UniProtKB/Swiss-Prot annotation:
TM stretches of this protein: none
Domain of life: Bacteria
Species classification: Bacteria, Pseudomonadati, Pseudomonadota, Gammaproteobacteria, Vibrionales
CDD domains: ADA (cd01320)
Cofactor(s) the protein needs: Zn(2+)
E.C. designation(s): 3.5.4.4
Species: Vibrio parahaemolyticus serotype O3:K6 (strain RIMD 2210633)
Protein name: Adenosine deaminase
Reactions this protein catalyses: adenosine + H2O + H(+) = inosine + NH4(+); 2'-deoxyadenosine + H2O + H(+) = 2'-deoxyinosine + NH4(+)
Amino acids binding Zn(2+): H12, H14, H197, D278
Key words of the record: Hydrolase, Metal-binding, Nucleotide metabolism, Zinc
Cofactor note: Binds 1 zinc ion per subunit.
InterPro entries: A_deaminase, A_deaminase_dom, Ado/ade_deaminase, Metal_Hydrolase
Length: 334
């Protein structure tokens, strides 16, 4: 269960993986895009996981429909704005919304820097209207190669005052982190934090590389750390965060069952792991589900669930003063 008088955070939440079915339908119609169905009920199975059996291929095919309808920069702005409202509706006090501007721009050849600006505008408007605190993490999509990632990074850094970190996501096996060392030197030189998707498709060596060569202080998913005792010790001793996404890891076949997810062992070992959604619209879940259903199914005790919630605030890319402000805001909440 969620501890009400502690801030609830979602630090690993893809803005471009959380596009409402209704929005996909409306934007598809607006831009004359052929969709697999033309009402919400019929469209849902094409854009959201409804199958019981996990499948990475099915997951990714559903993910792509959201960005397929981003026909102009206003559509990107709308999606960013709605993401802030969705976070509010999920009882989240602080969200870090991550997005790949190249992925969002690709289908309709939008200007990548324009996408970043539109997302910043949408999130800032959402914060004003909904009173929730959110920050942005820019993603380099390694799947598209080093040159595309440099273009993406240039666009992200053009709005660096509105972005707290840069992430590397996508094809972990085909595009290993060593190809992006110079990119992340630019990130660190710009004063931004580093989080990297690692130890999801590839093994623990990918996590070592992200930490030691790219400068990651947080790792997205990181499930393969469990196979490397030295890495487990290093994560705990150096307070490297693990952004765990239980339902997502099951739906993408990263783990074969929630019961076999390593999150409980991470927490037992003193690793700073927290609970997050990943792509909530595609998964058909929200953050309360991760706390109330997925975490107990993964074997976490109530005390461990509470610890994961505490870890989420500690790992947030905000100042100690901002963390204290969030704590103060919710301390009397019941």
């Amino acid at each position: 269960m969620i501890t009400k008088n502690l801030p609830l955070t979602d630090l690993h939440r893809h803005l471009d993986g959380n596009i409402r079915t209704k929005t996909i339908l409306e934007l598809g119609q607006k831009f004359g895009i052929a969709l697999p169905a033309y009402d919400i009920e019929s469209l849902t199975p094409h854009v959201q996981i409804v199958e019981a059996e996990p499948s990475l291929v099915a997951f990714l095919s559903k993910l792509d429909w959201g960005v397929a309808v981003l026909g102009d920069l206003d559509a990107c702005r709308r999606v960013a704005y709605e993401n802030v409202e969705d976070a509010l509706n999920a009882q989240i006090d602080y969200a870090e919304l991550r997005f790949s501007p190249y992925y969002m721009a690709m289908k309709h050849k939008l200007p990548v820097a324009g996408v970043v600006e539109a997302v910043v505008d949408g999130v800032q408007a959402g914060m004003r209207d909904f009173g929730i605190k959110a920050n942005l993490i820019g993603i380099m999509s390694r799947t598209f190669g080093t040159d595309a990632c440099q273009q993406e990074l240039d666009a992200i850094l053009s709005q660096k005052d509105h972005i707290v970190a840069v992430d590397l996501a996508g094809d972990e096996l085909g595009q290993p982190g060593e190809r992006f060392v110079s990119h992340f030197k630019q990130v660190r030189d710009a004063g931004l934090n580093v989080t990297v998707h690692a130890g999801e498709a590839a093994g623990a060596e990918s996590m070592w590389q992200a930490i030691q060569e790219l400068g990651a202080t947080r790792i997205g998913h990181g499930v393969k750390a469990i196979h490397d005792p030295k890495l487990m010790d290093y994560l705990a001793e150096n307070r490297i965060g693990i952004e765990s996404c239980l339902t997502s890891n099951f739906q993408t076949s990263t783990v074969d069952s929630l019961a076999n997810h390593p999150l409980k062992q991470f927490l037992d070992h003193g690793v700073l792991a927290c609970l997050n959604t990943d792509d909530p619209a595609v998964e058909g879940i929200e953050l309360p589900y991760e706390y109330e259903v997925a975490a107990p199914a993964a074997g976490l005790s109530q005390e461990q669930i509470r610890q994961a919630q505490i870890n989420g605030l500690e790992l947030a890319f905000i100042s100690d003063a901002e963390k204290a402000e969030l704590k103060e805001k919710v301390k009397d909440r019941v």
